Design a protein with these regions (language model features):
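Pre-recognition alpha-helix immediately N-terminal to the DNA-recognition helix
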Residues: 2, 6, 33-37, 97, ...
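N-terminal helix-turn-helix DNA-binding core of bacterial DNA-binding proteins
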Residues: 8, 12, 16-58
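Alpha-helical linker/hinge and terminal dimerization helices associated
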Residues: 14, 55, 98-114, 131-138
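Short, hydrophobic-biased segments on the C-terminal half of alpha helices
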Residues: 48, 66-67
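Charged, amphipathic alpha-helical coiled-coil/dimerization segments
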Residues: 67-126
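C-terminal regulatory/oligomerization modules of transcriptional regulators
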Residues: 119-140
Length: 140
């Protein structure tokens, strides 16, 4: 149980650091993740249903995230070209710029890993990957 407690506490500390880095950019972590997802989509847009699947969020949560991003001019909704039942969320140029600035802020954070050697960081990454695979978070 000590390992689980440590992992959960580290997650809280890291999440707090990420939230603090994103706050000046007017983003929450969930909104930032949505912008990142749309940035890497082939056309810069995805069906909102697919966003929910990839972000592992309830459709209502995706709607709320897109509502806020749209209100800030970072995303726009578009009708799907071939499926009238589907709405696409598309990142705007302002959204790309905000995502880029926010990513720089997040990557500049000292997550406490600078005190580890490269080997220790690799070991930690490998161990956490094994735990994630064991609980079904992802496959090889």
């Amino acid at each position: 149980m000590a390992a689980v407690t440590s992992i959960m506490r580290v997650q809280q500390v890291l999440q707090s650091a990420v939230d603090a880095a994103l706050r000046p950019h007017g983003l929450t972590f969930a909104r930032y993740e949505a912008l990142v997802l749309l940035t890497f989509a082939k056309r810069g847009s995805l069906p909102m249903r697919v966003m929910g699947e990839r972000l592992q969020l309830h459709p209502t949560s995706v709607t709320n995230i897109v509502d806020r991003l749209e209100a800030d001019g970072l995303v726009k909704r578009l009708p799907h070209p071939t499926d009238r039942r589907t709405t696409l969320a598309e990142i705007t140029e302002a959204g790309r710029e905000r995502r880029e600035a926010a990513t720089k802020a997040v990557t500049d954070i000292d997550f406490g890993l600078r005190g580890l050697t490269e080997r220790q960081t690799a070991q930690l990454t490998d161990l956490l990957a094994k735990v994630r695979k064991a609980v079904g978070d992802f496959e090889d």
